[in-house]
Design a protein with these regions (language model features):
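N-terminal acidic, glycine/proline-rich low-complexity segments
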Residues: 1-190
């Protein structure tokens, strides 16, 4: 099982705190260690030491808990990746044209009030969960930590369970091509 986390860490922190019960003799943390092979999380900002990324800042204690106690591999897709790998609006709209009124297009228009290229914050995390490292460079191992102000820090460490995604101008087109191939296929036809 792979978990793609694209929001606050609240539910994942609660999962770690879940005791054994009538449904399983294992705690939540034990179940994660036994059943999950990867947590792919959109979280943090690694290049600006003062940036409080939204998903982390909304529930700092839960983010701290998840990244400190998660028992298996975590791959983080940081803010700067999603803001740099923009999905061009015309292609985004074309890829979702299989639906007469696609809810994603409608919600983007309602939010932005205009056509605009889309950040891929959450999409990069999901793409890694679905497709692995094919479009990305993955950092070496380390620890991904959240301080009390909600600032994220990655510290390289051979025994760390965290890594983060990297990409650059040369690889952004491949990332967008991957999104396009997934989004342009009507629901249920993958």
């Amino acid at each position: 099982m792979v978990i793609a986390s694209v929001g606050f860490s609240t539910n994942l922190a609660r999962l770690l705190d879940t005791p054994a019960d009538e449904y399983s003799p294992h705690t939540g943390k034990e179940l994660v260690a036994r059943k999950v092979r990867l947590l792919s999380a959109m979280a943090g900002h690694l290049s600006d030491p003062n940036f409080r990324e939204f998903n982390v800042a909304q529930d700092v204690p839960s983010a701290q808990k998840v990244f400190a106690e998660w028992p298996i591999e975590v791959v983080v897709s940081p803010f700067e990746l999603g803001v740099s790998a923009k999905y061009p609006w015309d292609r985004f709209e074309q890829d979702l044209s299989w639906a007469e009124k696609h809810p994603v297009i409608e919600s983007c228009m309602a939010y932005h009030q205009r056509e605009c290229d889309q950040n891929t914050f959450d999409l990069t995390s999901v793409l890694y969960a679905v497709d692995g490292p094919s479009c990305f460079t993955v950092s070496g191992p380390g620890r991904f930590e959240i301080n009390d102000e909600g600032i994220s820090v990655f510290t390289p460490c051979e025994k760390g369970n965290a890594r983060y995604l990297l990409a650059d101008e040369a690889t952004y087109p491949a990332i967008i091509d991957c999104f396009s191939s997934l989004l342009s296929c009507p629901a249920g036809q993958h």
